[in-house]
Amino acid sequence: MIEVYTEHEQGKKWLEKHKNCCPIFACILGFTATGLIPRISAAGATPEDRKYTAIADAEFLIKGIKSDYQYPLPSLKKGVSPVFITRALVESLNIPIYLFNAGLVYPPPIPHIDLGGIAANCLTTGKALPLTTIRHLFQQGLHWGEKLAINAPNSYLIISECVVGGTTTALAILTGLGIDATGKVNSSHPQCNHQQKSSIVRTGLTQAEFYPILQPIDPFSLVGAVGDPMQIVAAGMAIAASRQTGVLLAGGTQMLAVYALIKAIIHDYQESANLEKIVVGTTRWVAEDPTGDTVGLAQGIGKVSLLATKLSFLTSECPQLRIYEEGYVKEGVGAGGCAIAASLSYGWTQEQLLEAIESLVNAKKELF
């Protein structure tokens, strides 16, 4: 149920080492005003909806099926939020959840850990976040990475995200780090909006006086210019956790950007990390997205093992899930990473995965 796409030897070793281990799940929430740009994302039908996507996903992740929510899941043009996949699996498998607010407009209405960050300005400003905030969030990431690793000895930590517009800030980080990512990233749209993303990124890097890129850019300054608050927390968390335990960066484009950021930070700031213990895990809808090139992107970053769950919705009775097979939604809130964990740690089959996810979707449908 798990495919290794790059760095096959490292990926297979990582999977073998963590087979039957019980993971911990961390989800880092963040917001960037980049997500409010018209048509930038399908994670919410309108810009107004997208203000609340991360908060609504977080509320559903923690509460599951309830009769009412403070922030109901926003309507999507097609399909359902990937949080249905994540919630179904963490609930069924009783995986511990740690929810982090790295920087949101509004705090989530459920128990969470506030890291003292702020929501990011649109990356087109070239001034997404103050450098003091970036440094603070990185230290918070290091602190919690070390703390969670202690709770997961001889196991692994799943680090996930929920940031609307995050594949665009990911493209900005990758581009700023000198990685050829144009035309290779993914999005929640069935056809990735590459031209729009590239134009936005060029504007932001130009405003920050980083474009054209003629020399290496300090990674902290880069995130401060065109990034989002999740990225630097995830990087710090993975760096610290990798010193003691395995790390599964659960996501596609966004977590590949985090991995590239990790490499830049440990190079520029001599932070110790064990990159052999860090892999990126996503869905096959991302890994095999014909409108992007996730595998090529991972190869361009270098020395990162890209894994993906083989989870399929082709035979699903739920049309909201079958639409994933047409390229809608694809990933988010650690959905791919949780499906990988279900197969790796608990031996779940395609049938078990589908049954758990469909049960949750149907329960929600019956209630409303």
From Swiss-Prot:
Lineage, top ranks: Bacteria, Bacillati, Cyanobacteriota, Cyanophyceae, Oscillatoriophycideae
Entry's Gene Ontology molecular function annotations: nicotinate-nucleotide-dimethylbenzimidazole phosphoribosyltransferase activity
CDD domains reported in the protein's UniProt record: DMB-PRT_CobT
InterPro entries: Nict_dMeBzImd_PRibTrfase, Nict_dMeBzImd_PRibTrfase_arc, Nict_dMeBzImd_PRibTrfase_sf
Organism per entry: Rippkaea orientalis (strain PCC 8801 / RF-1)
Name of the protein: UPF0284 protein PCC8801_3324
Family: Belongs to the UPF0284 family.
